[in-house]
């Protein structure tokens, strides 16, 4: 140890000892610390155990067996990494490297013999296995032990697998409604009950079990294949684009009621029929409408409610104008103040309706007429003075008291001024 330290210290400041005692330049040492080229060229099989310094010991005992790498390395401790080449660009982890030996590889599903192959699990559910065992027994009822025996005899996987699959068989028998437990008779030998298939689900369960048994697990079930190959018109529900005769009749009645009917006397009131149906109508009928559930009497009562509620057709025929003309006899009180009377917009579907004449002029015209009336009253008062002799009114003198003589004189002066005007 001391000799190696002295040998390292004996090298100059510009030199450094290499891994094999050689001398390297400082620049080369810096490049080796920052470069990752060694990682791509690294291989576990080619890696050698580090050499111990002279006089050193191996406290952990890693190098007692030659040719083995320290188990502290995660990749070296994995036996799956032995024999696997490590090339740049194709990393191999310890999880993906764990695979069965070549002799234990699973064969293709089409070539599997479940009776002799112990490495491939059958692609059947536990309920299907139970059903297959009951059907193979040719008896109306079967014991649990007989089900176990049939499964192990026909599937080699369950002979070598963990016996926990038997718990799954028992759970399926107890919880699945397709199986019924039959109690043992008193005079029958043995113990434990029997199991059989419920007749309500027997046909469906047996057909599904043996169809799966004949075909490999990767194939499509025959029932689904036949359903997919059928044409849409052959479907029992008629397909998404086919409409039965009853639905077509209902659709025709609906078009006649909405497209050609009117309010009460449709043709007499509106003057014409609709020539085009509604632009958006659904021709697909997925379920019968609610009108099928009504009796003929109820449908007769609902017939007067059918009508055309198209506002555009109503305004084209001028029906609203006739309705508004009937309002001319009504007297509408003007607003309390001119400010509260705003513009009334009677535009419906882009058509403007003029205000009735009884509604009165706008606020500005009413204000102008009010000013004109006040001016007219003032001028008429000046143009037509009081005629004391011609009028039957009493003279103003007796009305006023004795102290108001001056006021009566002033009134007479105003009357004389008005005569000149």
Curated annotation (Swiss-Prot):
Keyword Isomerase included in the entry's annotation: no
PROSITE patterns: FORK_HEAD_1, FORK_HEAD_2, FORK_HEAD_3
MF terms (GO), sorted A to Z: DNA-binding transcription activator activity, RNA polymerase II-specific; RNA polymerase II cis-regulatory region sequence-specific DNA binding
Location in or out of the cell: Nucleus
Highest rank taxon of the organism: Eukaryota
Deleted gene: phenotype: Mice lack motile respiratory tract cilia and exhibit randomization of the left-right body axis due to loss of motile cilia in the embryonic node. Motile type cilia with a '9 + 2' microtubule ultrastructure are absent in epithelial cells, including those in the airways.
Compositional bias (Gly residues): 11-21
Region (Disordered): 1-32, 77-110
GO-annotated cellular components: nucleus
GO BP term, example: positive regulation of transcription by RNA polymerase II
Residue ranges: DNA binding: 120-210
Family: Belongs to the FOXJ1 family.
Job of this protein: Transcription factor specifically required for the formation of motile cilia. Acts by activating transcription of genes that mediate assembly of motile cilia, such as CFAP157. Binds the DNA consensus sequences 5'-HWDTGTTTGTTTA-3' or 5'-KTTTGTTGTTKTW-3' (where H is not G, W is A or T, D is not C, and K is G or T). Activates the transcription of a variety of ciliary proteins in the developing brain and lung.
Name under which the protein is recorded: Forkhead box protein J1
Lineage: Eukaryota, Metazoa, Chordata, Craniata, Vertebrata
């Amino acid at each position: 140890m001391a000799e190696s330290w002295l040998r390292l210290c004996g090298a100059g400041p510009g030199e450094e000892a290499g891994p094999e005692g050689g001398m390297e330049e400082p620049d080369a040492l810096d490049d080796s610390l920052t470069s990752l080229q060694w990682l791509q060229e690294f291989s576990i099989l080619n890696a050698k155990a580090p050499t111990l310094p002279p006089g050193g010991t191996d406290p952990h005992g890693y190098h007692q067996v030659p040719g083995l790498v320290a188990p502290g390395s995660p990749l070296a401790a994995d036996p799956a990494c032995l024999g696997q080449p490590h090339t740049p660009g194709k990393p191999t982890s310890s999880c993906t490297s764990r695979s069965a030996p070549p002799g234990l590889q699973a064969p293709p599903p089409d070539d599997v013999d479940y009776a002799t192959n112990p490495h491939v699990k059958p692609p059947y559910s536990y309920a299907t296995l139970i059903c297959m065992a009951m059907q193979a027994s040719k008896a109306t009822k079967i014991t649990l032990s007989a089900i176990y025996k049939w499964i192990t005899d026909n599937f080699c996987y369950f002979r070598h697998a963990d016996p926990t699959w038997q718990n799954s068989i028992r759970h399926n028998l107890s919880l699945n409604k397709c199986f019924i437990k039959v109690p043992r008779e008193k005079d029958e030998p043995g113990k434990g009950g029997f199991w059989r298939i419920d007749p309500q689900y027997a046909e469906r369960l047996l057909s599904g079990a043996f169809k799966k048994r004949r075909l490999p697990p990767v194939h499509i079930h025959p029932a689904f294949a036949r359903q997919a190959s059928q044409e849409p018109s052959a479907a029992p529900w008629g397909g998404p684009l086919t409409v039965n005769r009853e639905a077509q009749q209902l659709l025709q009645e609906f078009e006649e009621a909405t497209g050609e009917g009117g309010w009460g006397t449709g043709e007499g009131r509106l003057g014409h029929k609709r020539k085009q149906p509604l632009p958006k109508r659904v021709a697909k009928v997925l379920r019968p409408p609610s009108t099928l559930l009504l009796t003929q009497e109820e449908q007769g009562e609902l017939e007067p409610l059918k009508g055309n509620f198209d506002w555009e057709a109503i305004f084209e025929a001028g029906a609203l104008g006739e309705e508004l003309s009937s309002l001319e006899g009504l007297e509408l009180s003007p607003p309390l103040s001119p400010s509260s009377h705003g513009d009334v917009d009677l535009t419906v579907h882009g058509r403007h309706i003029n205000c009735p004449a009884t509604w009165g002029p706008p606020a500005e015209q009413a204000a102008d007429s009010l000013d004109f009336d006040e001016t007219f009253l003032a001028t008429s008062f000046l143009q037509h003075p009081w005629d004391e002799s011609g009028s039957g009114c009493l003279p103003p003198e007796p009305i006023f008291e004795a102290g108001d003589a001056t006021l009566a004189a002033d009134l007479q002066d105003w009357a004389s001024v008005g005569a000149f005007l």
